[in-house]
C-alpha cells in the first residue's frame, strides 16, 4: 500500500486480514492517515504496517480511557454516570440522553464545555477467524463500534472494541475525542 493506493485497498486489508468492516466515512478518514504515513516514511506499507497504524490511530490511544460507568434507564430517560481517565487525571462525568451513547456524549460535552454531536455510528461483531494480534490475546474484543463525531465544528472518527457493544461504543467516542485532542495540540 503506498500513498497513491485508494481507500478500497486499505479497507480490503483490514476486512480480509483482521475482520474490521470499515464504514465508508471511516475508510475516508483512515485512508488520509495511511497516505500521510506512507508519505512520511516514503515507502509502501505492508498489511502489518496498515494494522499497526490502524491500532495506534484508533484503538491504542492512551490519552483517554473509560474507567467505571453505570447506565440507568428510567422510563425511557437514560443516564450515564462514570469516570474517564484523561492523561493523569480521572474526571467524573454525568449526563442524560435518549440512549447510552447520547447520555455519554452529553456528559463529556458538558464536562469539557465543547459542542459534541454524533454524525455517524456503526457496529458489528468481530469474527474470530480474522483476528488482529491486538484482539487475539484479548478474546473479549468481539464487538467493534465506529463513531464519527462533530467536535466544535470539526469531524473526527473513532473506533472501539470490547466484549460489550455499549463499552465498544463508549470507547469509540473516546477514540474520536483523542483524535480531536491530537489535532488540537498539532494546530496550536
Region locations from a protein language model:
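Terminal or standalone catalytic/regulatory effector modules within metabolic enzymes
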Residues: 1-188
Amino acid at each position: 500500500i503506498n500513498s497513491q493506493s485508494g481507500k478500497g485497498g486499505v479497507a480490503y486489508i483490514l476486512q480480509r486480514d483482521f475482520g474490521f468492516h470499515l464504514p465508508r466515512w471511516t475508510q475516508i478518514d483512515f485512508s488520509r492517515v495511511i497516505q500521510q504515513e506512507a508519505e512520511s516514511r516514503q515507502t509502501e506499507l505492508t498489511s502489518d504496517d496498515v494494522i499497526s497504524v490502524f491500532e495506534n490511530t484508533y484503538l491504542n490511544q492512551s490519552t483517554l480511557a473509560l474507567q467505571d460507568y453505570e447506565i440507568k434507564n428510567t422510563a425511557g430517560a437514560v443516564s450515564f454516570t462514570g469516570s474517564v481517565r484523561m492523561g493523569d487525571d480521572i474526571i467524573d462525568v454525568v449526563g442524560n440522553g435518549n440512549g447510552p451513547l447520547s447520555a455519554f456524549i452529553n456528559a463529556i460535552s458538558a464536562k469539557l464545555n465543547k459542542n459534541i454531536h454524533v454524525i455517524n455510528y456503526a457496529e458489528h461483531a468481530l469474527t474470530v477467524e480474522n483476528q488482529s494480534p491486538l484482539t487475539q490475546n484479548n478474546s473479549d474484543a468481539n464487538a467493534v463500534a465506529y463513531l464519527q463525531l462533530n467536535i466544535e465544528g470539526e469531524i473526527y472518527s473513532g473506533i472501539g472494541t470490547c466484549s460489550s457493544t455499549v463499552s465498544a461504543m463508549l470507547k469509540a467516542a473516546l477514540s474520536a475525542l483523542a483524535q480531536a485532542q491530537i489535532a488540537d495540540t498539532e494546530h496550536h
